[in-house]
Amino acid sequence: MDSINKDETSKTADKVGAKFQLTDAEVATAYSVVNGSYAWYVSSYTEQLFGTGNNQLLKIEQRVVSEVAGATTFNNEWNATYSNLMNLTQMIEKCSAGGIDEGKNDLLGMAQLLAAINWGVLTDLHGDIPFSECFIVGNSAPKIDSQESIYTAILKLIDDGISNLSNGGSNAGEQDIIYGGDTQKWLALGHALKARYLLHTYGRNKSVISQVESEAQAAIAGGFAGFYLDIFNGVTADNAWSAYQWSRYYIGSSKTVDDLMLERNDPREPYYNFNALGGNVIGIPGDTELASLTETVNEPIWLENGAANLAIMSESELYFILAEAQAIQGKDAKASFEAAVSSNVAEYFEICGDEISSDDVNAYLSDIEPLFEANPLKEIRIQKYLAQTRGEMIETYNDMRRIMYTDGNYPVTMQNPNNNGGTGNRWPYRLPYGDSDVVSNPNVAAAFGSGNEAGMFIFTENVWWAGGSR
């Protein structure tokens, strides 16, 4: 009788082909993991955007400890990312030896690269996390692994992904809604990701910088033009940023960014600081009055384009990585720097519903040339900061912590006065763990702390690649 209502024609999860899980993995990575609340909140910490609307982001601007360090703040994103990783782990198992899709190396490589991105987001933001014992049946309390060991695994996932994709294949088909199953594009992505994650570890191992350069060059040679989810129409399907803004109007433009743009006569400035709501006022980081306003503060106009793509890794990020690696080694980085800026400016205008001529782009490059010539590394990093104001704040947050560790300071000074409260630093060096594991997993609960110390480690302890021990 136990099986009387069982549908014998319905396949269980372990019998579903891996390719049918790919689309969901791509959408979740772009929409929930990279461009969801993680990025929305972090954009206040990096001051690339301003939190307004008299609600959660008001508290973030004020650096209210219960919001910044609370376990409930990122619980949805924590759970969504682990859920996506469970899906990707199933794909990898199905495409590995003994799996139902054994030999489908293209699918295996795609899943491995996506898994590297998702694990990267989790450990970059949270530090030491449950990893090696996750998704094991019967283990409801996986141990916490060190970020150093997780990075070893991430880089292996990328290497394995590149190896598998090198064998070609056409098993993904239309289920791959980003690259259409093109393994050459996935291969280029693999090298781009290798450059990104190696650069994160530069503070721990200076010798990786030449490999960062070579991997970036390999990605460019492979034709890398960005990794974007471009499936939205702005009517029945909106990207994550526009959907969030239209439902709440919690995001505004930041004076920290606008001042840098004005200093450089940046053609993106009118689109970044756009008077969309009639208030014609720009957000000043930490200003409680402005953060308390509703539907008043200026916003980047791209937020009003619901059809805009979502970047998982942009073309400009890769060129900025290459330029930084070259500059660190004392090499000529001008061509890479100009390619990075040109790529982003053109993309920014397109997303904002406009276009810019090559002459105007070249004029801007001429305007900022003296800044580059005076200090190439500084201007590379500032321009990357400006370029990543459209949805790439997680990587900026990573850059800030990495560079503060290697260089002692970041070239863009944060202006929010609430970063330094009367009781010490209130700019988080990482994000708190998700509440579901703080409550149910004793290992995470112990790491999170209890009582007055619960979550407070985020203000004092860096992640491993930024010089910390957890």
Residue ranges and their predicted role:
Residues 29, 33, 92-95, 388:
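Short amphipathic alpha-helical segments enriched in hydrophobics
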Residues 332, 336, 394-402:
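Composition- and surface-driven signal marking solvent-exposed, interaction-prone regions
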Residues 15-19, 53-352, 371-377, 383, ...:
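Structured, solvent-exposed acidic/aromatic patches
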